[in-house]
A protein has these predicted regions:
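N-terminal phosphate-binding caps/lids of nucleotide- and nucleic-acid-binding domains
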Residues: 1-212
Length: 212
């Protein structure tokens, strides 16, 4: 059931280069294209709306590389269900990554809301111990600080880029509206619109002549 779907979803996300088809009770539940693009796998697993609300992340700090996607601040959620971390290609639950992600989003989203992500973290094997949890779902970092820093800065820099792009497009829109208003003849002569086009004393005289 759900546990199987969950495993297939996570495997598909960690291997966008492999095409997956999952059929349950004769119905196709999941199909990924295997085109090597993470965004394609996300689209297949989580759907179009989720995929459209994402910002790309691509960052390296020393020996640690962080890449994937985070949700736009306006697409935050009421829970952490859509936080997906992969360390060296394996789906992992890690408090360090979760805290780093949420700290980077502080001030960008409302309190009580949570960011979503599909983030790959590549790091040297010697700084992790995967044998903490029987299912190997949790990891312990020999040194948490560099991992926290890499994820925090990766997310923060992507959010800042997104924010500056949003501000730039808002400025562009505002500037365009100002230019339009400047060159709109009706804006400069609003009185014309409120009065009849032809009105003069001569006209009154003509009307009076015909009225006789």
């Amino acid at each position: 059931g759900n546990a199987v779907s969950n495993i297939i979803d996570k495997t598909a996300l960690s291997h966008p280069e492999i095409a997956f088809t999952y059929i349950k009770d004769g119905k196709q539940v999941l199909r990924t294209f295997g085109d090597g693009k993470l965004i394609s796998a996300i689209y297949s697993v989580f759907g179009k709306d989720f995929a459209k609300g994402l910002i790309p992340v691509d960052y390296q700090l020393d020996a640690i590389k962080v890449y994937g996607y985070i949700s736009k601040p306006e697409h935050s959620r009421p829970n952490r269900n859509m936080q997906n971390f992969f360390i060296n290609g394996r789906y992992i639950k890690t408090r360090t990554a979760m805290v780093a992600l949420e700290e980077a989003f502080k001030g960008s989203i409302m309190v009580g809301k949570f960011p979503s992500c599909v983030l790959n973290i590549e790091l040297p094997c010697e700084i992790i111990d995967v044998n903490v949890h029987p299912s190997k779902l949790e990891v312990r970092f020999i040194n948490e600080r560099p991992v926290f820093d890499a994820i925090y800065h990766a997310v923060k820099s992507s959010l800042m880029k997104y924010d500056s792009r949003k501000k730039a497009s808002f400025k562009k829109e505002t500037a365009f509206n100002e230019v339009q208003n400047k060159f709109n003849p009706f804006n400069n002569a609003p009185a014309i619109l409120n009065k009849p086009v032809v009105q003069s004393s001569k006209n009154d005289f003509v009307q009076k002549q015909y009225a006789k």
